[in-house]
From Swiss-Prot:
GO molecular function: 2-methoxy-6-polyprenyl-1,4-benzoquinol methyltransferase activity; demethylmenaquinone methyltransferase activity
Reaction it catalyzes: a 2-demethylmenaquinol + S-adenosyl-L-methionine = a menaquinol + S-adenosyl-L-homocysteine + H(+); a 2-methoxy-6-(all-trans-polyprenyl)benzene-1,4-diol + S-adenosyl-L-methionine = a 5-methoxy-2-methyl-3-(all-trans-polyprenyl)benzene-1,4-diol + S-adenosyl-L-homocysteine + H(+)
Record's keyword terms, sorted: Menaquinone biosynthesis, Methyltransferase, S-adenosyl-L-methionine, Transferase, Ubiquinone biosynthesis
Signal peptide location: none
HAMAP family reported for this sequence: MenG_UbiE_methyltr
Protein name: Ubiquinone/menaquinone biosynthesis C-methyltransferase UbiE
Listed EC numbers: 2.1.1.163, 2.1.1.201
Protein's job: Methyltransferase required for the conversion of demethylmenaquinol (DMKH2) to menaquinol (MKH2) and the conversion of 2-polyprenyl-6-methoxy-1,4-benzoquinol (DDMQH2) to 2-polyprenyl-3-methyl-6-methoxy-1,4-benzoquinol (DMQH2).
Pathway assignment: Quinol/quinone metabolism; menaquinone biosynthesis; menaquinol from 1,4-dihydroxy-2-naphthoate: step 2/2; Cofactor biosynthesis; ubiquinone biosynthesis
Organism whose genome encodes this protein: Coxiella burnetii (strain RSA 493 / Nine Mile phase I)
CDD domains in the cross-refs: AdoMet_MTases (cd02440)
Amino acid sequence: MNETEKSTHFGYQTVPTDQKTDKVKHVFESVAAKYDLMNDLMSLGIHRWWKDFAITQCRLRTGQRILDLAGGTGDLAKRISPLVGDEGEVVIADINAAMLNVGRRRLLDQGIFRNIQFIQADAEKLPFPNNFFDRIVIGFGLRNVTNQLAALQSMHRVIKPGGFVVILEFSKPTLAPLKAVYDAYSFQLLPRLGKLVAKDEESYRYLVESIRMHPDQEALLSKMTDAGFEDCDYHNLSGGIVAVHRGYKF
């Protein structure tokens, strides 16, 4: 669907474009407290390996300024923080205050605060100067953005020349047998887990549907190119259930 149209998708529903942001906001307000626990249950803990792999693709160095976009609960930021050191900076930006509050408490409890900032921000209109960050990483957040092209263009604007973006996101399984098992697991088990653990079946049904509506590997690659990124590539993880995309700004 063209992102400039007056309607867009919210999971499998078609909704007015100006309503999607609020609907997604309500989902993440509902799931914030149990979000990381549910990630463990939904992925059988494999999300930790996916995130570790994404961070290795960032090639981080001491002193760099990193944007962890849609970084809410701080699960990527806690991996990034020691790699850039006290001379560096990690900015966690998320549109959802509830997710940021969870992340702030969690990182403080773990003693991770010296090089961390939390900012509530819209990915489509990032409130940072041009050429500001050495790297941008966004984990499992892009599919929830209403206008993904606008968000990618905003990322391109604020990243420094020579820097790059790393996008960790659910994608499309590349093996037919895996797809059948994955569909059954996603649509039958995950909403039930959401109901049991987070007391919210509908929000987790949306999260499953949002994965299916997200562009596949090649379509996202094309969208990154349209936003101005160059030398874009991707790695499939777990048979394409997840992909890590990377694009440079020169």
